Amino acid sequence: GENGHIQFLSKGRAVTYSKEDARFQDNVYGAWWDSGDYGCMTPEGTLLLKDRQVDLIEHIDSNLALEDVLLEKLDFLSEVVIIRDVNGAPQPIIALADDAEMNWEAWWAMVADLPLLKEPILMAYDDIPRTATMKVQCLKMEAEMKEKNL
């Protein structure tokens, strides 16, 4: 299917965001609500979540899928996050699994046939900023990279 914003028509949706009604109303289109997610419907009717709209990177179909593949195939990693660098290019941020060492040969072999990624930045798992629900704060990481001109 065609990629696009995921919108819902539901009696069970929220009516506002706490203390952020204007931001909520910006995402309401009549009876429809824009979830902030991005994806597509398969011909069989399955909804595929690809990314948050704010996290989209040009030439990457799905950051989430790419991160999942890298985590699944490279057992020395405990986290993979792909954010935009200051020029909008895909910048992997990776954390190593406990007691693991970076296997550069395996990394470069794995990403050779993927969309062009910059050399990953290694971070400790606990240093990757997260929300209270453990979601990685990609926009915060991008802002920090911009401050450091990385």
Question: Could you tell me what each predicted segment is?
Answer:
Residues 2-4, 31, 45, 88:
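Structural signal for glycine-centered tight turns and loop->strand junctions in beta-sheet-rich domains
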Residues 33-35, 123-124:
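Short, small/polar residue-rich loop motifs at catalytic or cofactor-binding pockets
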Residues 81, 121-123:
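Residues embedded in well-ordered beta-strands within globular domains across many folds
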